[in-house]
Design a protein with these regions (language model features):
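FAD-binding core/adjacent interface of flavoenzyme oxidoreductases
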Residues: 1-10, 25, 40, 44, ...
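A Rossmann-like FAD-binding core segment of flavoenzymes
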Residues: 87-124, 183-274, 326-332
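Alpha-helical elements of Rossmann-like donor-binding domains used by nucleotide-donor carbohydrate transfer enzymes
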Residues: 80, 208, 314-317
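Short glycine-/acidic-enriched loop or helix-start segments at secondary-structure transitions
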Residues: 19, 42, 103, 138-140, ...
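Beta1-alpha1 glycine-rich phosphate/pyrophosphate-binding loop at the start
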Residues: 5, 12-90, 175-203, 271-273
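Short, glycine/charged-enriched secondary-structure capping and boundary segments
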Residues: 23, 45-49, 107, 141-145, ...
Length: 332
């Protein structure tokens, strides 16, 4: 086995990359492991997505993100993070899933398995977990959810021109998908279990989706729950009636959550109500000595509290703790 790494970062999204860059700049031998591709969550975002934020708030490693318009696109962000990894010559193991972490502070053993079944292990003095949350959708828990025409991820509208599509959810992802589908010729029904759209819709999305609903261009069913999905219909129960909605495609855009089971496997204590992990807010060290947390995993169920914009600074706090430097104030 090779010499131990000073730090192994689990997760190669923007937060994990930022953490690895900070560690490398501090002279720490660092490895980044991810079960998917680089920035796997961003890769699975809608193809034509434009970020809500401006480019400087997505930057890591003091590298500028240059984009053609005011706000970066998904493609521009992916290119930027590839270039950042190349610039800092990060040591990456992509397509390797962490199956187990054993040992203790000062000498952890990280075991992985690749998609073709090849196993590997790495020794690390410290661990940073930055696994995000986009891999694990909040499931509906209804029959038919696993049918091939049901997806928890929206990609693009083209295949659904002149087709019946049901979008489930009432927050930004669902509203934007419904609008995109409508504008590209799909017949869209939006189903939401709450009595109204989410309170935190983007300021330019809310009037757009509300006007489309008011005009009857997008059908919306509020206070309505999904009861079953089959190959042709979505069965719903709403105020005073049950009905079935024709659908060649169903997008269940009901949110996502961190891998709490993995955190528990590592020994991290979670709050029984919020699932927020036990963690020192200054150093980001969990209750497991030598095991640090970064990014949205620290938010528990409240995934809307952590974004790339603030998660990208968590690595500075972690590396400051590892090198004995006074950590900066927690990112907000």
């Amino acid at each position: 086995m090779s010499a131990p790494y000073d730090l192994v970062c689990i997760g190669a999204g923007p937060t994990g990359l930022a953490c690895a860059i900070e560690a490398k700049r501090a002279g720490l031998r660092t490895l980044v492991i991810d079960k998917g591709c680089l920035c796997n969550s961003l890769y699975h975002y809608p193809v034509n997505m434009i970020f809500f934020t401006t480019p400087e708030l997505l930057e890591i490693g003091d590298l500028p993100l240059v984009c053609a318009a005011e706000k970066p696109t998904r493609v521009e962000a992916l290119k930027y993070y590839r270039k950042a990894a190349e610039h800092y010559e990060l040591d990456l193991r992509l397509g390797e899933q962490v199956t187990n972490v054993c040992g203790s502070d000062g000498r952890f053993e990280v075991h992985t398995r690749s998609g073709d079944g090849v196993t590997a292990s790495y020794t690390a003095r410290k661990i940073a977990v930055a696994t995000g949350y986009y891999d694990l959708p909040n499931r509906l828990g209804v029959p038919g959810e696993d049918l091939p025409h049901v997806s928890h991820y929206y990609t693009e509208p083209h295949p659904f021109w002149r087709q019946d599509v049901v979008v489930i959810g009432g927050k930004n992802s669902a509203a934007e998908a419904a609008l995109d589908l409508y504008r590209n010729g799909a017949r869209v029904t939006l189903v939401h279990r709450q009595p109204a759209l989410g309170a935190n819709l983007k300021y330019w999305v809310r009037p757009d989706i509300e006007n489309r609903i008011k005009a009857g261009q997008i059908r919306a069913l509020f206070d309505t729950r999904i009861t079953k999905i089959d190959r042709d219909f979505v069965f719903v129960s709403g105020p005073g009636e049950e009905q079935k909605l024709p659908a060649v495609q169903v997008f269940a855009l009901t949110g996502y959550h961190p891998d709490f089971a993995f955190l528990r496997q590592l020994g991290v204590q979670l709050d029984p109500e919020t699932n927020k992990p036990a963690m020192d807010p200054q150093t980001h060290e969990s209750n497991v000595p030598g095991l640090y947390l970064a990014g949205v995993v620290i938010g528990g169920n409240h995934t809307s509290e952590i974004f790339i914009e603030n998660g990208r600074f968590h690595g500075k706090q972690i590396v400051a703790a590892l090198t004995g430097v006074t950590p900066p104030a927690p990112a907000t």
